[in-house]
């Protein structure tokens, strides 16, 4: 609950700023257990809020423990099956494996948060904060650009099925680019060259600083917002828009030809293959939508921190976007398990106990062989 008595808050903040932390108020305000030498990790904004009860921390620890298990099981399963199945070792699926790796990197944050929740402070202080933030920065920006790469691949594969498919070398170059993309805004705050990492919310998680009231912080947050969110979003919307346009034009052409030939349908084996690819594209679009749902609240919080009304930024309102982001990294692999036809076939073969029933299709085999030939070029 937000402290409404402004006079009391002002006195508390003044005393805290002078003394570093206040033993007599340990059960009342955030930052009560942060010693003076680490006081820079806690922005004065958070010190005006009552410290959350232990049950809040335990609740978060339980939630993140469940998310950790789901993420590791799901993403490791994706990497295992896509990497060891010949029919799934295609350039397009290299992006899926890359996305799963970024999701696992995000999962590395979760044990740190669980431990921090029981300690009611950030584990490892400044070093722990930096490590936690680096994991979040790499995984968040990596997921964004990998989603953009998947959108580009789906557009090329479906719009130009004969000569538009990426080969393995091209896919590897794009994946390497996604790793390059995450580097600047991960390393600069880490080295404190531009921006910095600091605690947020319940002070058991860390991210880049979006509360310091100076021009340097405003410019940094604006740039990372454009770099990590806006640019990937533009690419994703562009490629999926073109993909939808291509599908509509293709279907329109088939209807017109069928009408001229006085037949019901002109669907061939190639069109059945295209239908399977469209199904996979729908999976990719679903994951993009989940990404948007997860990271838009976090981006909004950061912008409010530098440009908006900071009274809206309570510990709870800044912790929830982090939970959403972690949840999506756990859901991604299960979306594929439910919807990806060839992935379901492999799961059916290797994990019969899951009770999956996905029939073998000629179109899937043809698609796999086509991509395999393209890979070897």
From Swiss-Prot:
Which keywords does the record carry? Answer: Chromophore, Disulfide bond, G-protein coupled receptor, Glycoprotein, Membrane, Phosphoprotein, Photoreceptor protein, Receptor, Retinal protein, Sensory transduction, Transducer, Transmembrane, Transmembrane helix, Vision
List the Cytoplasmic topological domains: 82-93, 153-170, 248-282, 340-377
The answer, when asked if Zinc is one of the entry's keywords, is: no
The protein's GO terms of the molecular function aspect are:
G protein-coupled receptor activity; photoreceptor activity
A single GO CC term for this protein reads: membrane
Instruction: Quote the tissue specificity entry.
Output: Expressed in the dorsal region of the retina and sparsely expressed in the ventral region.
Database matches in CDD domains: 7tmA_photoreceptors_insect
Q: How does it sit in the membrane?
A: Multi-pass membrane protein
Asked if the record carries the keyword S-adenosyl-L-methionine, the reply is no
GO BP annotations of the record are:
detection of light stimulus involved in visual perception; phototransduction
Designated name of the protein: Opsin, blue-sensitive
């Amino acid at each position: 609950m937000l402290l409404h008595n402004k006079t009391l808050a002002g006195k508390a903040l003044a005393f805290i700023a002078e003394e570093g932390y206040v033993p007599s108020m340990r059960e009342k305000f955030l930052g009560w257990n942060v010693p003076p030498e680490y006081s820079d990790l806690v922005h004065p904004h958070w010190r005006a809020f009552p410290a959350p009860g232990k049950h809040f921390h335990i609740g978060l620890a339980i939630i993140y423990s469940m998310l950790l298990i789901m993420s590791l099981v799901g993403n490791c399963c994706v990497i295992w099956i896509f990497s060891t199945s010949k029919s799934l070792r295609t350039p397009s699926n290299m992006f899926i494996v890359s996305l799963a790796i970024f999701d696992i990197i995000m999962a590395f944050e979760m044990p740190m948060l669980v431990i921090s929740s029981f300690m009611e402070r950030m584990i490892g202080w400044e070093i722990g904060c930096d490590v936690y933030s680096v994991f979040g920065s790499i995984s968040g920006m990596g997921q964004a650009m990998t989603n953009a790469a998947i959108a580009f691949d789906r557009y090329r594969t479906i719009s130009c099925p004969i000569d538009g498919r990426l080969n393995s070398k091209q896919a590897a170059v794009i994946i390497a680019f996604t790793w390059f993309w995450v580097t600047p805004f991960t390393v600069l705050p880490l080295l404190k060259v531009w921006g910095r990492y600091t605690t947020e919310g319940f002070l058991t998680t860390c991210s880049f600083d979006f509360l310091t009231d100076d021009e340097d912080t405003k410019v940094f947050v604006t740039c990372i917002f454009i770099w990590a969110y806006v640019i990937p979003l533009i690419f994703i919307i562009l490629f999926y828009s073109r993909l939808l346009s291509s599908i509509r034009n293709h279907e329109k052409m088939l209807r017109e030809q069928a009408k001229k030939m006085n037949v019901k349908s002109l669907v061939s084996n190639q069109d059945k293959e295209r239908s399977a690819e469209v199904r996979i594209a729908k999976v990719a679009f679903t994951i993009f939508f989940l990404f948007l749902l997860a990271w838009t609240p976090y981006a909004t919080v950061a912008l409010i921190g530098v440009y908006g009304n900071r009274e809206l930024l309570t510990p709870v309102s800044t912790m929830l976007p982090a939970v959403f982001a972690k949840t999506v990294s756990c859901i991604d692999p299960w979306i594929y398990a439910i919807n990806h036809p060839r992935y379901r076939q492999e799961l059916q073969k290797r994990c019969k106990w899951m009770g999956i029933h996905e029939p073998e299709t000629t179109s899937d085999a043809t698609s796999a062989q086509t991509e395999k030939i393209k890979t070897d070029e």
